[in-house]
Design a protein with these regions (language model features):
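Membrane-interface helix-cap regions at the ends of transmembrane helices
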Residues: 3-5, 53-72, 138-151, 193-213, ...
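Loop-to-transmembrane-helix transition segments
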Residues: 13-19, 60, 65-90, 154-162, ...
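Hydrophobic/small/kink-forming positions within alpha-helical transmembrane segments
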Residues: 22-27, 57, 81-89, 111-116, ...
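Transmembrane alpha-helices of multi-pass small-molecule transport proteins
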Residues: 38-86, 165-168, 188-204
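C-terminal transmembrane-helix exit sites in multi-pass transporters
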Residues: 91-93, 111-132, 252-271
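Helix-helix packing/entry segments at the starts of transmembrane helices
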Residues: 104-109, 176-192, 228-259
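Hydrophobic transmembrane alpha-helices of multi-pass small-molecule transport proteins
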Residues: 129-145, 269-288
């Protein structure tokens, strides 16, 4: 097999892994939205991180892989983990009232937050073309939410807050990836996420009604962990610039699942706004690729909020 054919094959496998990852994340959001009718959103988020942490212990076993606990940027690891946990909680709470496609369309603006924050935090300043794309993208968010016009539920602002938290999490992840591996970052994200929510769990705990609900609750951690595993695996064999556009295929899955599970159909405002957001995000990727700033690194894995 020629080098070119091998590279093409690796990229196709990477794309398949990315599409599989976002499909699992769509299933996670669907499960969380369903469980929201049975229990508190904090309990769902805590179960998601606790189950993922247990899986990390089983797969990685820090007793035999002691490097898993050794981070050179402990403060930043804690900060990014708290931001990720906060984004998950806010997203799950928002899903109590929003349709899956509505919440995801807002979350798709996280690359804009990254682009804005990367200037002061990473020294990666953006030009007027990308500023225009960001403004267009946030215009799409206004079209989706329609504030002041009796549009979407105010919970949309929780999705926006979740997106901001996730954007700063992604920027800090870029910083720690220079010295820590993905495995270390994933371990701390799951551990800190479960730990920070633990004190409030006794006050919001609801025992699952039956074994199916209990399995779904544990399944949130499995879906999240499996999705991140596919995400990391895809970035190891294909450039981020090739994989990133396929993040947006998650919208296809949430529209299908939203209809099948909740009988939700996207309205024209959501679809029009989502088109603006996705188009602006793809243009940002195009500009970064053209300017040579889109890099492939095992330590930099950015994907959907989960």
């Amino acid at each position: 097999m020629s080098d070119l054919a091998h590279q093409r094959r690796q990229r196709l496998i990477g794309i398949a892994l990315m599409c599989g990852a976002v499909a699992l994340f769509a299933c996670l959001d669907t499960t969380a939205k369903y469980l929201n009718t049975r229990m508190d959103s904090l309990e769902i988020a805590w179960a998601r991180y606790t189950a993922a942490f247990v899986l990390t212990l089983i797969v990685s076993n820090p007793l035999t892989h002691k490097g898993l606990l050794r981070t050179k940027r402990l403060t930043l690891q804690i900060t990014r983990s708290v931001l990720l946990a906060a984004s998950s909680v806010l997203n799950f709470v928002a899903l109590r009232w929003l349709q899956l496609d509505e919440a995801l369309s807002i979350i798709f603006t996280f690359p804009f937050i990254v682009a804005i924050a990367a200037g002061p935090l990473l020294g990666e300043w953006i030009g007027w073309r990308r500023w225009a794309a960001i403004c267009c993208g946030f215009g799409g968010v206004l079209l989706i939410t329609r504030p002041g016009f009796g549009g979407m539920h105010p919970a949309a602002f929780l999705s926006l807050a979740a997106t901001i938290c996730y954007g700063f999490y992604a920027v800090i992840t870029r910083i720690v990836s220079r010295v820590d591996s993905n495995q270390i970052s994933l371990f701390y994200a799951n551990f800190i996420g479960a730990l920070v929510m633990l004190p409030v769990i006794p006050f919001v705990w609801t025992t699952p009604d039956n074994w199916l609900i209990a399995l779904m609750l544990m399944g949130t951690g499995i879906l999240g962990s499996a999705g991140h595993f596919l995400l990391i695996a895809g970035h190891r064999i294909a450039p981020a610039s090739v994989l990133s556009p396929f993040v947006y295929t998650q919208l296809i899955w949430v529209v299908i699942l939203g209809y099948l599970v909740f009988d939700n159909v996207p309205n024209r405002w959501t679809m029009a706004g989502a088109t603006m957001v996705i188009g602006s995000g793809l243009y940002l990727l195009y500009r970064e690729r053209k300017l040579g700033k889109a890099t492939t690194s095992e330590g930099v894995v950015e994907g959907p909020l989960e």
